[in-house]
């Protein structure tokens, strides 16, 4: 893994008046490029083969230049070239997936956020330790499938985009659906409304919703649209569907906007605060954008089952701002908020606090 000291050495050669914001052309890159351009940065899109043609349809978000690779792993070998352009990499899920975790953490280019958070997020045991230390309610984990007494969610290790999930209500259903060649986690199925909560933690701002160090913002929230789970039950009851050979899947295909009851916002902020404070104690903080995936029950309990320590695709709903971010700054997207953080840190000589 690249060290903080190495990153600081790279920054000594940077022209901070000519920073380039770069990411892989996927996931939330249009939003990232749009936000960077609004804050006066040059942008660089990373892609394999020729640049995506559909980017031409969005001129305000199309990057100023492209870095075309034969393979995403070749990005590691282009680090010096990127540094000469004063590049800061903005990670998103696709970037980490295409590069691989080891390549991402070892990439010799200054990167927004704390790369150590990937290790804590992707390791289920470490993530559980993080959540439990933060005092967060989580769905009960079931170690032995024979102990399944009601609906459970089974998730395969490394599930991406909603692939690798299934629901079972007893051991028999579990046995019929499980792939024993893969590692999996079983936890109770929580009945409620799913919320993806989009936060931003700034270690360099000391106004707004302040923490022991820095401040916390709630930028937006969304709910996932999943195929085929969101439409399948129009065809019949779950048992009828299974008998017909049709099983629900949870592949992410899009997102829809949400706002929460105002009375819940206090708990939503407390939840984010607990996550950040514990991250500061464990590994130096979850800097920048992050998302808590939770279910809010009919008794208004919030149970957390996942965390993403970077910008998530649900924020793409709010390129022109959300009902929450508009109350802080007009037309503030998560992509633009990232660019603002970099801009403010560069001006105040605090890039060391937000890059890794």
Swiss-Prot record:
Gene Ontology MF annotations: ATP binding; ligase activity, forming carbon-nitrogen bonds; magnesium ion binding
Residues the record lists as binding Mg(2+): 293, 306
Binding site for ATP: 145-196, 226
Cofactors named for this entry: Mg(2+); Mn(2+)
Pathway: Purine metabolism; IMP biosynthesis via de novo pathway; 5-formamido-1-(5-phospho-D-ribosyl)imidazole-4-carboxamide from 5-amino-1-(5-phospho-D-ribosyl)imidazole-4-carboxamide (formate route): step 1/1
Reaction catalyzed: 5-amino-1-(5-phospho-beta-D-ribosyl)imidazole-4-carboxamide + formate + ATP = 5-formamido-1-(5-phospho-D-ribosyl)imidazole-4-carboxamide + ADP + phosphate
Name listed for the protein in its UniProt record: 5-formaminoimidazole-4-carboxamide-1-(beta)-D-ribofuranosyl 5'-monophosphate synthetase 2
Organism (species): Methanosarcina mazei (strain ATCC BAA-159 / DSM 3647 / Goe1 / Go1 / JCM 11833 / OCM 88)
Gene this protein is translated from: purP2
